[in-house]
Amino acid sequence: MSTVQTVLGTITPNLLGRTLTHEHVALDFEHFYRPPPPDFESELKAKISMSTLGYVRLYPYSSKENVRFYDEEALEAAKKDVLLYKKHGGGSIVENSSYGLKRNLEFIVELAKSTGVHFIAGTGHYIHAMQDASHASLTVEQMSDLYSKDIITGQQVNGQMVKCGFIGEVASVYPIHDFEKNAIKAAGEIQEVLGCGVSMHPHRVTKAPFEIMRLYLEAGGRADKCVMSHLDRTIFDIDELLEFAKLGCYIQYDLFGTECSFYQLNTSVDMISDGQRIDNLIKLIKEGLVDKLLMSHDIHTKHRLTSYGGHGYHHIHTNILPRMFDRGVTLEQVEQMTVTNPANWLAFDP
């Protein structure tokens, strides 16, 4: 029987409830720090407060405090928001911190125990530039062995074996680095053997998701067990997105809550708004793709947590879904995107 492998053990898919499929509760994002504009250097070097928050929202990756999403303050704020997520109807969170992002399995387990939210942890590799010496030269075979052990055997955390429940996020730049190609191929190989879900992080160019899927499918991975993340900042043209959808993977809009006039990680594009995300999802629903759509926030900086003036993990449930209902999306369609699709993606027979 297919089950979902959480950090506290396996559960039946129907117990997941509403699920956020791409989040982080602790990670190190300092690699993406950008020097602040000279005019705002003092504000962005200062501690985040009401008097500096406006600058942090404009230049989130220019505040070192903001990208340190792993210190005690961040963990306390994340726990508070997971509890709010639970209060507002949240059931499960898929934690996408992989090798290179300094995943904190101990904290994820503690959150699962203390909040009652189901957590599914990922294995896999982030971009090559963020790997330490022990991982930077791994072969496909070594990666495959590592991923399978993380899923089948698990890692010891405070005396208990904690197993990962999917492979992800598997991240790449563009052109895709050879190390990242190995990670994508290893994900495809292990997916074929184990049947688990996989989540991909493409670079911020339209060609990237297509190339990732080619490598993954050639390695043996199933399209219907693969999520392509961050498509709301990668493929902006709906016709092109529909063309990509023909490959059969899940289409994930996972930057809900990110609304900015200046996108620091790709200054050549304008980040779409939540309203535009809703409109695009409605267009995809009308094209018959409701069974391939997923939604999340990809929270990875402090300023998106409520303790720092952000929206928290409950934003989709409390602010986005009501707007979708107002625009004619049905409860059945919302349940498909937030409950059924995540369960179908995550369920496998380990």
Curated annotation (Swiss-Prot):
Taxonomic superkingdom: Eukaryota
CC cofactor: a divalent metal cation
Top-level EC class: hydrolase
InterPro entries per the UniProt record, alphabetical: AryldialkylPase_Zn-BS, Metal_Hydrolase, Phosphotriesterase
UniProtKB keywords: Hydrolase, Metal-binding
Residues holding a divalent metal cation 2: 169, 201, 230
Single GO BP term: catabolic process
Cofactor annotation remark: Binds 2 divalent metal cations per subunit.
Pfam families: PTE (PF02126)
GO molecular function: hydrolase activity, acting on ester bonds; zinc ion binding
UniProt: a divalent metal cation 1 binding residues: 22, 24, 169, 298
Keyword check for Nucleus: no
Protein's UniProt keywords contain Hydrolase: yes
CDD domains: PTE
Protein family per UniProt: Belongs to the metallo-dependent hydrolases superfamily. Phosphotriesterase family.
PANTHER family referenced in this protein's UniProt entry, alphabetically: PHOSPHOTRIESTERASE-RELATED, PHOSPHOTRIESTERASE-RELATED PROTEIN
Protein name according to UniProt: Phosphotriesterase-related protein
Organism: Drosophila yakuba (Fruit fly)
